[in-house]
Every structure is written in C-alpha cells, then in structure tokens.
Design a protein with these regions (language model features):
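Flexible, acidic/Gly-rich N-terminal and inter-domain linker regions that tether
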Residues: 1-46, 57-58, 253, 261, ...
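Conserved alpha-helical substructure of the radical SAM core
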Residues: 3-146
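Flexible mid-to-C-terminal extensions adjoining Fe-S/redox cofactors in radical SAM and related proteins
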Residues: 4-8, 320-448
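C-terminal accessory region of radical SAM enzymes
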Residues: 236-287, 314-366, 371-372
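Short, basic/aromatic recognition patches
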Residues: 288-298
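Short, small/polar residue-rich loop motifs at catalytic or cofactor-binding pockets
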Residues: 300-303
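Short, acidic, Ser/Thr-enriched surface-loop or helix-capping motifs
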Residues: 309-310
C-alpha cells in the first residue's frame, strides 16, 4: 500500500506504522522497540484468510472466481480456530477476513471473536451488500478494527462490474450502517477502464458521503481478473489516474478534510509520487524516498509481509497467487509453512534481489530499493515467470534510468520482456466538474 495522504501531504493514520515503521517515521532500534519498528524484512505477514469462496455477487475481476454456491473443502469452525491460535502464536500483525463474501459464512463472528481474544487485530473485506443495521452492530461487537467495502464506480458502473443489479445501493446502505454504529469503515476500488473516466465523480462521492478512507487498487490478472486484462489501464491512463488521486487528496488535505487515501498493488506509485513531489518540495521528497526504501515496496510484500490462506487451508504468497500453494494448514501449521524455504518460489520471494530480471532488476532500474520490483504475481501471470519485469510499470525508460547501454545489457541476458499494457491509445479522465473545489498544493508542513 502507498499512503498518498501521508507521503504526498504529510498526513498521519493509524496503520502508518505497518508500512513505514514506528509512528510511520521509519525503524526504531534497541531494547524495547515496538513490533512495528522491525525492518520490513523482519515483520510477520499481514495475513489474508479467504474464509469462504461463496459470494452473492459475481464480480468481473474476482481473483477467487467466486459464485453464489457452496464449495467443498471449507475449513471447519474448529479447524479455523486452530489456525487462528497458530497465527496468534506466530504474532501476525493483522488478520484480514476475506472471501468470496465472508459475511456468507455463518460462523464468521465466532471466528473473529476468537481472534480478538488471542490479541489478533481483525479486519473485514466485504462487498457490503449483506450489511444491514443488525449486521453492522454484530460487526462492531465482534471487534473488527476496520471494514473495507468494495465499490468500483457510481451506480450502474458498479453494478455492471459487480454482476448484480442494485449492488451499489446495497453497498452504500452497508457503508452507512457501519458509520451509524461507529464502526471504522472505508471503500476499496479497483482501477479499470470501466471507472477510469469517472474518477472525479468517485472523489466527489467520497466527500459527499463522508468516507474517511479509500483504497484504489490496481488490477491484478488473477481469477476472473485474467479475463479482463485488456480492461487494465494503459501506461498513460495510469499516470492520469494517479495524477487525479494526488490532486484530489491534496485538495482534501488543504481544506482540512481528514481522509486517508491509498493506492494498492503497484509499488511503482510510490516512485511516481516521489518524482512529482521532488519538483515541488525536494527536501520532503527525500524524506519520502527514505520511507519508501525502508518499506522496500514489492521486495517485502508477497511471501514476506503479506500471505494468504484460502478457504480450503492452502497457503499462498498473497491472495492473487492461488495457482501456487506452499502447503495446507490441515497438514502443517501456517507458521511452519511460512518459514519453510524448501519451495523455490518461497525462497526466491524471501530473497528476490538477485532473481528479478529485465528493466526491473537492481542495477538496471535506479529505484529498485524503493519499489522492490513491484508485484511478482502480475509478472508470473503475464510472463509465466515470477522474476520477469512488472508488466504494469508505467514509468518511462528515462525515469528509471534505463539507458541504451542498459537496454543492450538486458537484451544480451535474454531478459528483454514485452510490456503489454503500453501500446493502446489512452482514454482521458473526464474533467473535474465545475461544482467540485479546485485542487491545490498541500500546505501541511514537512512531515513525510
């Protein structure tokens, strides 16, 4: 995750310590240093548990290819509690209950309360359509620290994306129900050509509905997401989208609207943000680069700082890497599977510097230490090689220092991979409506 609010505008948020060290300021060292002060490489993984594959919607980008039916092999309640005890002993920083649609699982609140009793910080990833006022009260009582509700556009745009009419209205109802009981809640949106042109409308919605947190995800071509890979944004479209996100986040900050805006699943965003900030505030930009480098980007993400357990108990490097399992928690505890590097992929993910190829490799891309090669699973899905360059990198050769000499070197190594998302003619983001306040520069001090 790239916290635009923090890095671009100097804001602060509860979860900054997970991404940027103690207090969001980088690491602390010495006796008694808190868990978030560990280096990014040392931290236990934020763990996603897909508690069920069943879902009441049929989203066109669903990485688990879920549907409204019962799937066999789901971990039982007792198996789930055994898993949770192991995760607690392993001292994971957070457990994200996901799906499918996790609220379709009848024992969800029992599992969450068990996690809370063992000191685990539980969060919920949901489509929001099943959240009534009563459900919101249950969510609050169970002890979820955060609820992320998925929306992928306004009105019919979202419903087409979600595969069910009325999904937008029901998700908004769920969001408001959570707000009504004092539950911390935010929105999750995946950037595609379906919603790209309406980004300003989405930000207007965020302001109008008093959304305090919004995460903008880049498309990953897993599950049904692979069927809509052509709907991913081109390089130019991605730059436009991130520009809008930066501009509107600046405007929120300038007007004193305390909103946490993040981008997810493309660590290139951090470098792009840094380059934009460098032109405006070089001193703060260097502070931002230090935080990005401490975080390590993709280097400490999949297989290191994030992991996944699917509904049948299979362990994956992240929630998009369903095509490769390292083991099953019915046979071995997650803690043992996660620390076992006998699988070449797990070993590589935990020490990937020497493996990443092409324009992303260290010594080729000058931002490797801060980006870390971005999303390895996207490279694997596109190139059938987890160490290939990030297909969704939208920085130019000049921006990453990919000189003609380096290009010859990469070609000589046989690492001249095609970059498939760059060739389409770009669309344009619709202009900001006249009724929306103008975006201006941040004025919030020098905190990175």
């Amino acid at each position: 995750m790239i916290s635009v609010s923090k890095l671009y505008c100097g804001g602060t948020a509860e979860s900054d310590g997970l991404r940027y060290g103690h207090g969001g300021q980088g690491p602390q060292v010495g006796p008694g240093a808190p868990p978030t002060s560990k280096t990014a490489a040392q931290r236990r993984p934020v763990t996603v548990w897909n508690v069920t594959r069943t879902c009441n919607l049929r989203c066109i980008h669903c990485y688990t290819d879920s549907d409204a039916k019962k799937y066999s092999g789901e971990l039982t309640t007792e198996e789930g509690k055994t898993l949770i005890r192991d995760l607690a002993d392993f001292e994971i920083p957070a457990l994200l209950f996901s799906g499918g649609e996790p609220l379709a699982r009848p024992d969800l609140f029992d599992l969450v309360e068990h996690a809370r009793s063992l000191g685990i910080r539980p969060t919920l990833s949901t489509n929001g359509t099943l959240i009534t006022d009563d459900t919101a009260r249950q969510i609050k009582r169970a002890g979820f620290t955060y609820v992320g509700i998925s929306l992928d556009g306004i009105g019919e745009i979202n419903d087409r994306f979600r595969g069910v009419g009325g999904a937008f209205d029901r998700a908004v109802r769920g969001f408001k129900a959570c707000v009504g009981v004092g539950q911390r809640v935010g929105l999750r949106l995946t950037l595609t050509r379906h919603n790209f042109a309406n980004l300003h409308g989405i930000f207007d919605f965020i302001e109008r509905e008093h959304v305090d947190r919004a995460c903008f995800y880049h498309l990953v071509y897993a599950g049904r997401g692979g069927q809509i890979a052509d709907d991913d944004l081109s390089r130019e479209e991605t730059r436009q989208a991130i520009d809008v996100i930066l501009e509107r986040t600046e405007d929120f900050h300038r007007r004193g609207l305390n909103k946490e805006i993040l981008t997810v699943d493309n660590h290139v965003d951090g470098i792009y943000l840094y380059l934009k900030l460098r032109d405006k505030d070089p001193a703060r930009a260097e502070q931002v680069l230090k935080l990005l480098t401490w975080n390590g980007g993709g280097m400490y993400s999949s297989g290191v700082g994030i992991g996944d357990i699917d509904f049948q108990g299979n362990v994956h490097a992240d929630q998009f890497w369903m095509h490769h399992a390292f083991g099953n928690v019915r046979q071995r505890p997650f803690s043992r599977i996660w620390t076992d590097t006998s699988d070449p992929l797990m070993a590589g993910l935990k020490d990937r510097r020497a493996k990443i190829k092409g324009r992303c490799a260290p010594g080729i891309c000058k931002w490797f230490d801060a980006c870390g090669g971005a999303m390895r699973v996207r490279a694997d899905l596109v190139h059938n090689d987890p160490w290939a360059p990030e297909p969704a990198c939208y920085l130019t050769d000049e921006e990453i220092g990919f000189t003609a000499e380096k290009q010859k070197m990469v070609k000589a190594r046989g690492e001249d991979f095609p970059m498939p998302a760059f060739s389409r003619p770009p669309r344009r983001v619709s202009p900001q409506p006249a009724s929306s306040p103008p975006a201006t520069s941040c004025t919030g001090g020098t905190e990175a």
